[in-house]
Amino acid sequence: MDKRLLDILVCPVTKGPLIYDKSHEELISRSARLAYPIRDGIPVMLEDEARQLTDEELDKWKDK
């Protein structure tokens, strides 16, 4: 994920920052509790395509 793109993108629900999860190819929105998929290098920033994060997953990203 290009750092410049990550600096520009925000969560479409909360307008908050996103965290890149390289291992799952997702962009994480802690405030919305959503993970947006990245398909073929392109972030899919649609709420309907995002998956809900579990409490355990949120804890993983708490300090990032």
From Swiss-Prot:
Q: Name one GO cellular component term.
A: cytosol
Q: Which InterPro entries match?
A: Trm112-like
- Superkingdom field: Bacteria
Q: Which residues form a coiled coil?
A: none
Membrane spanning residue stretches: none
Name the family: Belongs to the UPF0434 family.
What name does this protein carry? UPF0434 protein Tgr7_1374
